[in-house]
Amino acid sequence: MKRATSHRIFLLSPAYAGGERARMILRDQAQFPLARKLHGKSGAPIADVFTFLSGLYFRGKIAYANAFARPARGTSGVLVITPTRGFIDARTRIRLDDLREFAEVDIHEADPRYRMPIECDARDLATKLSAQSEVVLLGSIATGKYVDVLLANFGQRLRFPADFVGRGDMSRGGLMLRCAADRQELSYVPVAGAIVNGKRPPKLAPRKYAT
């Protein structure tokens, strides 16, 4: 029997803020549209910034989460995990100093700059969700940097797409874009006790998407 779910929240792992694309957008001389927004007073949506930093993987995550989130009234259905600010609504605008702050912290479960805000937000979110709700992690479950913090608060409510097993980031991004475009939701399994590694699935056939 299929598990009845009242609400579904997506947690998106962050883009790396210390790489070449981050340095590109952080440059004072950067003049492309997203950079001008980030450098301006109003900033740019964190989803747009992380999509620029990560490319296909984050683009797939945000498209998929927006397509299938079922949040409770008055709450966000798509939250981005950050290196220093806990969970942030994917629509939140960030500025230059925010991205620089993210770049200073490499996510690790033992780093209090990362762990303390995440634990606080996870506890708060857990109290607002019913036992039938699901929190779906769109990110790696192979290390403890997300799982160790989240499982303690969400337990069996913490899930991930079963089709992620055996796929790399690019394949996951392509799969999620395809599912969002086709309105075909993936199946989710509990993170607790999940098989982390598996046989690599066949490559996805190429497909073009509107930008």
Residue ranges and their predicted role:
Residues 1-211:
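Peripheral peptide segments
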